[in-house]
């Protein structure tokens, strides 16, 4: 048996010391002239088509750069920043939307009371089905009440074909994953009847043979409920993605 010292081997590899890792940026004085020059350069990009904007110093309120700032332009999805700001000022960041289900006038029917949660999930429907099964012996029909929203399903100027294109969904107060069909994220085709789809999905879980639109009767018995994520989470997702 040979001793380990008799074994031949290559040269030992030396590991170089790592470079200094990146450090978080720290506040400092900004070169406003250089910033303006860089923004001017970027704004000349022909791919931007018609472009306008302004940059404000948040400490002084002074405008440090602008390009056609007083020109009216189509705002696209940026207007949702104002909607988000208004919501966070008017509502508590922990505010949740509660979707409730009530027993129908027929004791074997249930009615979903849509409340505005357009990001409902399969897990929420599973939860509702489990709660309903404990409170209702047999479910023959599942209906949904959308009376909380009385406005139009399409905003003025919207192209209905954009629903099939996956860019928008009809404005209804209950949706599963924003009305997406066949996926939970992305620009996939959207449903033309997203609230009814919620009722259909819940009906499938309960083995109900009837699904449709309905209304919650006065003094109806609540049989199930689920909560949306808090407003802070919903607002973050709203401004992060161009999801209309």
State each model region's role:
Residues 108-115, 119-175, 179, 194-197, ...:
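Mid-domain, small-residue-enriched loop/turn segments at the edges of structured enzyme/sensor domains
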Residues 61, 75-93, 142, 174, ...:
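Active-site SXXK
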Residues 48-50, 68-70, 76-79, 94-96, ...:
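Extracytoplasmic
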Residues 179-244:
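A small/polar active-site loop signature that marks catalytic segments
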Residues 90-105, 210-215:
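Short, well-structured active-site flanking segments
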Residues 21-30, 67-75, 111-121, 183-193, ...:
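Second-shell loop/turn segments in exported
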Residues 31, 35-39, 124-128, 167-170, ...:
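Stable alpha-helical elements in mature extracytoplasmic
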Residues 4-72, 131-138:
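Beta-lactamase-like hydrolase cores
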């Amino acid at each position: 048996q040979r001793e380990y010292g008799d074994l031949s081997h290559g040269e030992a590899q030396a590991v170089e010391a790592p470079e200094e890792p990146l450090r978080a940026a720290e506040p400092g004085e900004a070169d406003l002239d250089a910033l303006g020059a860089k923004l001017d350069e970027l704004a000349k990009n022909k791919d931007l088509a018609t472009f306008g904007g302004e940059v404000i110093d948040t400490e002084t309120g002074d405008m440090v750069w602008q390009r056609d700032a007083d020109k009216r332009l189509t705002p696209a999805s940026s207007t949702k920043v104002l909607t988000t700001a208004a919501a966070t000022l008017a509502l508590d960041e922990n505010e949740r939307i509660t979707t409730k289900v009530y027993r129908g006038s027929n004791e074997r029917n249930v009615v979903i009371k849509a409340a505005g949660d357009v990001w409902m999930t399969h897990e929420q429907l599973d939860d509702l089905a489990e709660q309903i099964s404990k409170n209702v012996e047999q479910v023959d029909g599942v209906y949904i009440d959308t009376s909380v929203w009385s406005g139009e399903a399409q905003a003025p100027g919207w192209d209905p074909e954009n629903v099939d294109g996956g860019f928008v969904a009809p404005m209804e107060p209950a949706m599963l994953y924003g009305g997406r069909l066949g996926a939970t994220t992305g620009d996939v085709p959207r449903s033309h009847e997203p609230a009814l789809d919620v009722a259909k999905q819940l009906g499938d879980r309960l083995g109900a043979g009837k699904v449709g639109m309905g209304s919650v009767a006065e003094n109806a018995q609540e049989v199930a409920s689920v909560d949306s994520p808090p407003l802070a989470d919903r607002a973050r997702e709203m401004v992060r993605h161009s999801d209309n």
